[in-house]
Every structure is written in C-alpha cells, then in structure tokens.
Amino acid sequence: MRKCKIGIVGFGTVGSGIYNILSSAVDTHPILKEIEIVKIAVKDLGKKRDIQLDNNLLIDDPFKLINDPSIDVIVEVMGGVDLAKDIILQSLKLGKSVVTANKAVIARYGEEIYKTASKEGVYILSEAAVCGGIPIIEPLKRSLKSNSIKKMVGIINGTTNFILSKMQMKKLIIRRL
C-alpha cells in the first residue's frame, strides 16, 4: 500500500503539534505508518525552531507545496482568511483533500469551500475548527442524514466548554466565575 503524503501549510503551535504527533507517534497506531509528511510551508525558512526536523521538508511558498503532485492531502493551519481560502480552494481544485482548523475561513467561505470539494470529489475536513475540536460534525452528518438541517447556530468554543465544565464540576454559579 502506498503511503498517504501530506503537506502542512503553517508551522506555528498547531502545525508543529501536528508534525510532532504524526512523526513521533508512529508506533502508537498502525495507520500512522501509512502517513508521510513530505513538505511544510513556513513564512520564514531562517527562523529558529524548537522542534527537531529535517530542514529539507521546509518550503516558503505554500503554492509550490500544494502544486506538488506527490502530495495527496493538504493540512492548512496557517491562520488568516484570504490566503488560506485561496490555498484551500486551489488544493481542492487540484484534487487534494484538505484538513483545516481555520474557524475564520470556514465561517466566511465555508459554503464555497464545501461546494468546491463536492464538485471535485475530494474532502474538506474542518471538524478541528468547530467546538474546540469536539467531534460533532461527522456524528451529526451521519446520525441525522434523513433530516433536513439547514443551519446550526450557537456559541460553543473552547472557552465556553471550559467555563461550563468548571460550573458542572464544582457546581459554580456564573457570579463566582
């Protein structure tokens, strides 16, 4: 079986965390042996990094990364909106599935992004951008397939989850928080 080759766009806290997990936890789950990070797009090639990695993985042009025909999946964790949208859409149009944790780009351009993914027959996986990474999107899509949900609205994020958890665990009232 051929390995799934991944390109990461962005190497801040989230990008470097993904790199650490995927490169150091290979023995923890068999699927990780089938994944290979082949390129990482960064803003500054000369930046000193606290993480051990092969500098040959680094590239400073995200469009060169997404246009690399050897890369199967793009992980967009660069933040921002317009450039991230362009990278996501171009990746999808190139037939590459995309994983993103970018709340802002999904909130602003989600409809266009999802339509493009559907048209191109690839995936856009954005669950990490919703509810602090709580796995809610896929279960809702699978469990409620026969229903016609048009829209979901709410304020659920990591901070809200933290506050609600503290309230539940310690029976705190909002004034004390």
Specify the residue positions occupied by each region the protein language model found.
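Glycine-rich Rossmann-fold phosphate-binding loop(s) that bind the pyrophosphate
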Residues: F11
